[in-house]
């Protein structure tokens, strides 16, 4: 039986990539603690929590986790399609284990406007223009003394890290074919685009129906999230003090939906913001009953929410669209609550407004 073990640097990335793969590999749990994974569990995804860590810390954490990927028919290192975090250091940590003969690196994700040309990652902006993201992928790997080269269809896979270009979905299909035809041990490394190619043909669509009441929790400072919430009008409740705003939040939930936009006006650093948001999310979770559905953006926000309700794992059901998975909370005070999540940097301006309108909530 085929199995999947996936390692991501943040929770939304683990969820959206796992959601692409449940049709191929069956149910799996996404965890944020190694203790939540049973030793004999054939398939799982884990968030290393390293997106915001220093590069050396990220390397050390991933080096300890990477051996847990061994033994699966598909080992997958998920990286961000915008190359946020320390993707090269984390791939280095995986590669140094010696558990794989080749690595297929293909971070393109056409649906999200990310492509790779001549080993260079590009992102499409809201104005339709393409801009380079970071240094050339091969150069970044060479900076870490890794054996990496651009892959070409005629050459086949070579030992080391093979970097695949990609502009459209079928470009990633030939990367998948190369890996599936290889007789040795393969480490797959990419975003949701490569995951979708691995599971091409599997049905992972799920209904966009939300269970009432709907609670939204948003802590991402990404401009995309701000614009998406602006489009939702009066259902959004800005709050730097959940306890002080709880009556308004409860009244909104009684009407069907409350989108809480967390604020930290007195914070002086990202760490201060993260600690403040975690405290506010914990307070909110104690002051309200479990919602019917939870909508959340940003990996650290999702994790803070799961820790606050003492969840053990999230189980992806599939996705509303690429990059927007629907999952179910496993364990804890909110067990059984459905969660719609996404990266803070992803999505059209109307992504949440459209979802609420489809459910008669806006």
PLM region spans:
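Cap/lid and interdomain-hinge subdomains that line or gate substrate/regulatory clefts
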Residues: 1-5, 28-35, 42, 53-59, ...
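Short hydrophobic/aromatic-enriched beta-strand-loop microsegments
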Residues: 27-30, 188, 236-239, 312-321
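Redox- and metal-dependent alpha/beta enzyme cores, enriched for Fe-S-associated oxidoreductases
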Residues: 206-284
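Short glycine/serine/threonine-rich phosphate/pyrophosphate-binding segments
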Residues: 14-16, 86-87, 197, 225, ...
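Residues that scaffold, gate, or flank divalent-cation-dependent active/transport sites
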Residues: 18-26, 34-35
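Active-site histidine-anchored catalytic micro-motif
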Residues: 77-135, 290-291, 296-299, 303-349
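Short beta-strand segments
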Residues: 7, 45-47, 77-78, 104-108, ...
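A structural-propensity feature for long, helix-poor, extended segments
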Residues: 39-49, 328-362
């Amino acid at each position: 039986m085929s199995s999947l073990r996936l390692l991501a640097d943040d929770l939304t990335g683990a969820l959206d990539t796992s959601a692409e793969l449940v049709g191929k590999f069956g149910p799996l749990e996404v965890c944020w603690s190694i203790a939540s994974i049973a030793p004999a569990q054939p398939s799982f995804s884990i968030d290393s929590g390293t997106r915001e860590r220093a590069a050396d810390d990220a390397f050390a954490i991933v080096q300890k986790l990477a051996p847990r990927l061994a033994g699966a028919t598909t080992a997958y290192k998920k990286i961000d399609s915008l190359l946020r975090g320390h993707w090269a250091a984390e791939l280095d940590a995986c590669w140094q284990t010696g558990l794989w003969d080749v690595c297929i690196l293909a971070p393109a994700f056409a649906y999200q406007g990310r492509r790779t040309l001549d080993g260079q990652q590009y992102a499409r902006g809201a104005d339709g223009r393409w801009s380079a993201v970071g240094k050339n992928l091969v150069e970044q790997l060479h900076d870490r003394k890794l054996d990496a080269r651009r892959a070409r269809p005629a050459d086949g896979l070579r030992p080391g890290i093979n970097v695949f270009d990609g502009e459209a979905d079928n470009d990633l299909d030939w990367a998948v074919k190369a890996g599936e035809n290889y007789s040795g041990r393969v480490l797959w490394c990419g975003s949701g685009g490569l995951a979708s190619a691995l599971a091409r043909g599997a049905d992972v669509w799920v209904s966009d129906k939300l269970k009432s009441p709907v609670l939204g929790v948003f802590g991402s400072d990404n401009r995309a999230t701000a614009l998406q919430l602006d489009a939702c009008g009066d259902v959004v409740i800005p709050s730097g003090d959940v306890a002080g705003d709880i009556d308004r939040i409860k009244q909104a939930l009684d009407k069907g939906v409350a989108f809480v936009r967390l604020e930290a006006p007195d914070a002086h650093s990202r760490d201060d913001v993260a600690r403040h948001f975690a405290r506010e999310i914990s307070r909110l979770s104690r002051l309200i009953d479990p919602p019917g559905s939870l909508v959340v953006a940003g990996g650290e926000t999702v994790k803070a929410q799961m820790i606050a309700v003492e969840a053990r794992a999230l189980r992806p059901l599939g996705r509303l669209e690429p990059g927007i998975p629907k999952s179910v909370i496993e364990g804890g005070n909110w067990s059984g609550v459905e969660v719609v999540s996404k990266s803070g940097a992803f999505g059209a301006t109307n992504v949440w407004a459209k979802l609420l309108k489809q459910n008669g909530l806006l």
